[in-house]
């Protein structure tokens, strides 16, 4: 399979300097396996940049994403989206501030499987399709048809329940919902897990197009090749900490592999 790469969609040499990025400072998140699943993590993602996180699963990546998304409490530290502190903001407020989130488990976190495709496409944003407290079904249907066409969701029937679609098309619903609106920062956690080659290439192209449009993107993937192909910078996360951060153009599997199991990295 030929992966879409950061160069193949016209990446610039340096990220854009305008727009809204993400700044995480000294973030600590508690957990079950360790006292600190995320341990004093700090980073910045500028507009027009993809920061990829590599690492063996279970080293705090999921907890980091969930904390930024508002799904897990923060013990200490801060999260800023542009000039706005969203550390204690609700999920809806983060969403309205321009934070999008592709969760790692589409069926558990991303979709309501019994809901229709149309209802899943506006999940969490129903208040934008409401008039006097009543959902505007015509507006939802029109929006759903546009998103189905734009993101090539098959079959193109907004009234089907999400469970009736293939895994790849279920993932496209999530991607369409989170990337088909105005957003500043995207959290993409295992965005191509369990989907076919065609869907992988489509999702990669959408992520890179968003980066080129000036969005800041945090990518987490268990597929090291995916992280290497899409990222502008790569951080390795081990036992809740970033143990190395480097430009993706300088990174190799041979360099990153040892860091993923806690060994020192030669740079």
Task: Annotate each language-model stretch with its function.
Residues 1-267:
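Glycine-rich phosphate-binding loops of nucleotide-dependent enzymes
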């Amino acid at each position: 399979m030929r992966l879409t790469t950061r160069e193949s969609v016209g990446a610039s040499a340096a990220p854009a300097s305008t727009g809204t990025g993400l700044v995480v400072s000294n973030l600590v998140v508690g957990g079950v396996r360790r006292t600190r699943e995320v341990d004093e993590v700090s980073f910045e993602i500028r507009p027009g940049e993809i920061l990829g996180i590599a690492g063996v699963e279970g080293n705090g990546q999921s907890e980091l994403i969930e904390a930024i998304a508002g799904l897990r409490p923060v013990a200490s530290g801060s999260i800023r989206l542009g000039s706005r502190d969203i550390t204690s903001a609700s999920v809806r407020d983060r969403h309205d501030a321009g934070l999008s989130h592709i969760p790692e488990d589409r069926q558990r976190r991303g979709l309501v499987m019994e809901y229709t495709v149309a209802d899943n496409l506006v999940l969490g944003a129903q208040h934008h399709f409401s008039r006097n407290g009543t959902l505007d079904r015509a507006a939802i249907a029109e929006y759903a048809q546009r998103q189905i066409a734009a993101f090539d969701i098959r079959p193109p029937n907004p009234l089907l329940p999400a469970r009736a679609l293939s895994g790849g098309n279920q993932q496209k619903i999530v991607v369409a919902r989170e990337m088909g609106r105005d957003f500043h920062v995207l959290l993409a956690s295992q965005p191509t897990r369990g989907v076919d080659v065609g869907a992988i290439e489509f999702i990669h192209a959408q992520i890179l197009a968003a980066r080129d449009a000036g969005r800041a993107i945090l990518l987490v993937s268990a597929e090291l090749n995916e992280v290497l192909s899409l990222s502008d910078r790569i951080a390795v996360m081990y036992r809740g900490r970033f143990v190395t951060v480097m430009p993706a153009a300088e990174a190799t599997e041979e360099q990153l592999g040892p860091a993923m199991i806690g060994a020192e990295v030669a740079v």
